[in-house]
A protein has these predicted regions:
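PLD/PLD-like phosphodiesterase catalytic module centered on the HKD motif
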Residues: 1-165
Length: 165
């Protein structure tokens, strides 16, 4: 926590997407003016555990098991892995952008530690939470993959008939 407060006091923007509780208090003048904490509470217990560091378009991305809870960092081995492929970085950024824009399942933390749920706007796109959108994207990818696999089956059968009949 202290390192994030020091970063905020030095003018570094710190954005935290969390699942549940957070000991850091955002928006305290002179301490955490540059810290934003948003909790995403949807159908899934797990959260993305994506870490992005950088500014000015020079971002480094990591994925990992760590969720930065003190008891877990002190009593377990946690790992972060750098993401180096441009396409993977873009995918991670899309996930982060989706979560920051969530108007259904997102709760903004205030300096007193209380949370206030965001209210969806009239825009139909805000009616779905980020987790629901990610589920739809995964299902869409699965359908595309199944379609590609099923296209190959008749060709293989025809080829097999020609070779073995």
């Amino acid at each position: 926590c202290r390192a994030l407060y020091r970063a905020s006091m030095a003018g570094v923007k710190v954005d935290l997407l969390i699942r549940d509780t957070c000991r850091i208090r955002p928006g305290i003048a002179g301490l955490s003016d540059n810290i934003r904490v948003v909790s995403i509470v949807g159908n899934f217990l797990e959260h993305s555990r994506i870490y992005r560091f950088g500014a000015g378009g020079l971002n480094e991305y990591y994925i990992g098991s760590a969720d930065c809870m003190k008891r877990k960092l002190e009593n377990r081995v946690e790992a972060l892995v750098p993401v180096e492929e441009t396409a993977h970085k873009q995918e991670l950024q899309q996930i982060l952008d989706l979560q920051w824009a969530d108007q259904r399942d997102a709760w903004d933390m205030h300096s007193d530690g209380s949370y206030h749920q965001r209210i969806p706007t009239a825009d139909p796109a805000s009616a779905m939470g980020s987790q629901d959108v990610l589920v739809l994207r995964a299902r869409s990818r699965q359908l595309v993959a199944e379609k590609k696999r099923s296209r190959g089956v008749p060709f293989v059968r025809r080829l097999g008939r020609r070779l073995f009949l």
